[in-house]
Design a protein with these regions (language model features):
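An extended, acidic, His-containing surface patch that forms the Zn2+-binding/catalytic region
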Residues: 88-89, 146-223, 231-244, 252, ...
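Active-site metal-coordination/substrate-binding segment of hydrolases
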Residues: 1-49, 343
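Residue-level recognition of well-ordered beta-strand positions that form the cores
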Residues: 105-109, 137, 207, 227-231
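Alpha-helix capping and helix-loop boundary segments enriched in small/acidic/polar residues
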Residues: 18-25, 57-58, 93-94, 119-122, ...
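Short small-residue beta-strand/loop micro-motif enriched in glycine and branched aliphatics
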Residues: 15-17, 112-118, 213-214, 329-331
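Short glycine/serine- and small hydrophobic-enriched flexible loop segments
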Residues: 32-39, 133-137, 230, 350-353
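Histidine/acidic-residue-rich, glycine-tolerant segments that coordinate divalent metal ions
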Residues: 45-126
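A short core secondary-structure module
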Residues: 65, 121-142
Length: 360
């Protein structure tokens, strides 16, 4: 179904709306769980603090400052965040690890203005080609990243983690077909779940320079650039990776060009101990709310505020995901299945019950 308007609608047990699953709908499960508890039982056996902010999609530039300003009021024993998803329909999952993120841009400048390729081709540098050459050297077609030192600290999954991802109904061919691809790519010596969750990545998010409009324009651009994101895993230091990236770029820019390297974001990978009392309570809550044992999975994406809660605030954080991978977050037809919405409410209520007993 396409829901191109900004108004929500409901059809066949599904709510279609902007933010339905990312993240207003998932947030609402926790509010409604508390409301249901107070209406049916009475006082909630925990002190709850709800922290709601709307800048996550632009990197939450003010959130850390706000939390530090109100540190005493916001200090808690555990943080619950619902910004992940189930593994699939009827497959509830607890996420125990997130990849980190280092986001970089580099801008190469040649002449002080765009030039005519007939008049100046062969005697001036072309920033487009410099950027293309550097980007091509960063990562091979085999998926291997060529920046020296990039993989320092990367560890393979532990035995219990292998056992967990081998439980998953993972099908490379089905996923590739869903994405319109003949097959999955990357480091073929590693299974797809390992490449997606346990291995770091480097992806060129955008390149610019010169003329890319309709028709022809024989221009040698003055500037060109690329934006690159690197998803990091436990054992990698984001600042160190940024330094390695910058050194790699600067060493390859010819003397007849200048380069500017910009660092946008650095956040470390996070691993949440699965034996933490809050994680154990969450497993029971999912079992009661969804009627089945949750899978233990990692997530290839990053939620920078989780690292802040864990490393700076010293507050363990757990990730409840009630939506589905195909809920189309950010798209016009973003959705949230009502059955999962209701099970999410129940799971949140069960967590309050179980964790309050575990915490004493």
């Amino acid at each position: 179904m396409e829901n191109t308007s900004l108004r929500s609608c409901r059809k066949d047990g599904v709510v279609y709306a902007r933010g339905a699953t990312d993240d207003k709908g998932q947030l609402l499960t926790h509010l409604l769980a508390a409301e249901a508890w107070m209406k049916t039982i009475g006082d909630i056996p925990l002190n709850l603090i709800y922290l709601i902010e709307g800048e996550e999609e632009i990197g939450s530039p003010h959130l850390e400052e706000f939390i530090l300003e109100h540190r005493e009021k916001l200090q808690a024993d555990v943080v619950v965040i619902s910004d992940t998803s189930q593994f699939g329909p009827e497959m509830p999952a607890l996420c125990y690890a997130l990849r980190g993120l280092t986001y970089m841009e580099f801008i190469v400048t040649g002449a002080n203005q765009d030039l005519h390729s007939g008049m100046f081709g062969g005697i001036v540098p072309n920033p487009n080609q410099v950027v293309a050459a550097i980007v091509a050297e960063m990562k091979g077609l085999d998926g291997r990243i060529r920046i020296p030192g990039f993989y320092d600290g990367v560890k393979p999954p532990e035995g219990w983690e292998v056992a967990e991802y081998e439980k998953l109904p993972w099908n490379d061919s089905d996923l590739a077909a869903q994405l319109g691809l003949p097959g999955l790519s990357g480091e073929k010596e590693y299974p797809a779940p390992v490449r997606r969750w346990y291995r770091p990545t480097l992806d060129v998010n955008g390149m610019y320079g010169g003329y890319a409009g309709k028709g022809a324009k024989t221009v040698i651009p003055s500037i060109a650039g690329a934006k690159v994101s690197m998803r990091l895993v436990s054992g990698q230091n984001p600042e160190r990776v940024a330094e390695l990236f910058e050194a790699f770029v600067r060493e390859r820019v010819p003397d007849d060009c200048k380069v500017e390297v910009i660092r946008y974001q650095n956040s470390p990978a996070i691993i949440i101990p699965v034996d933490h009392p809050a994680m154990q309570a969450a497993k029971v809550a999912f079992r009661n709310g969804f009627g089945k044992e949750p899978l233990l999975i990692r997530e290839g994406a990053s939620i920078p505020i989780v690292a802040f809660f864990v490393d700076t605030m010293k507050m363990p954080s757990i990730l409840f995901g009630f939506g589905l991978p195909d809920d189309n977050p950010h798209a016009p037809n973003e959705k949230f299945t009502l059955a999962d919405f209701h099970r999410g409410i129940a799971t949140s209520a069960h967590f309050m019950d179980v964790y309050s007993e575990a915490a004493g």
